């Protein structure tokens, strides 16, 4: 007779079901229960990827909504439709509250449990990168002192991740490449530093190319995909530094079978 699954295993399975059903809010809840069950123990690679996918989808939907509403707001403003602008701003504020709450939830989990329990180099980089990502998402819509604080927290997390990645992970490692991708996007979009963005992306790409023959088979697909995204962004950024941002900038979006 098969032994009954532990609550942790059960919640991992439920998270996978929720993912298949595209019920990402519930997927987050199940993975938060997994984190609670793990206590001070490190999550498995599968568990951390499921957690990342859950939050990425929950935040991704709101980030997309915010961009659409902000675009409509700009159009209505240019037309002088003040009544509409006021309504849109209230609605945008509602989305921003949701974004703040989601980011706050994962950042608290990262600081209280995930980063302290990370033992291996790749898990430390994974979680510090994740911390940088969610501070960056806050910086996308915050203004004034709050934006400055979010940007500084992003930079601090990405730099800490970069130090460990450079010391412990190969240039072709998908987590190191994913960090370089998102860090360069931060320089370009949040700090308005296209030169630094291009330098970082270019260096990561060149270092990976130089060691491509050492790439392990299981991570070949993941690594080459991120390298292509780095190349896409470099092409976009260098083609016209004055571009209005109409083209979509690529960032690392993990799937369950991808290690970044």
From Swiss-Prot:
Which spans does this entry mark as compositional bias, Basic and acidic residues? 247-260
Family matches, as SUPFAM superfamilies? 14-3-3 protein (SSF48445)
The record's listing under InterPro entries reads: 14-3-3, 14-3-3_CS, 14-3-3_dom_sf, 14-3-3_domain
Q: Which Gene3D superfamilies match?
A: 14-3-3 domain
Q: Where is this region: Disordered?
A: 240-260
Between which residues do disulfide bridges form?
A: none
Membership in a protein family? Belongs to the 14-3-3 family.
Query: What is this protein's record name?
Result: 14-3-3-like protein
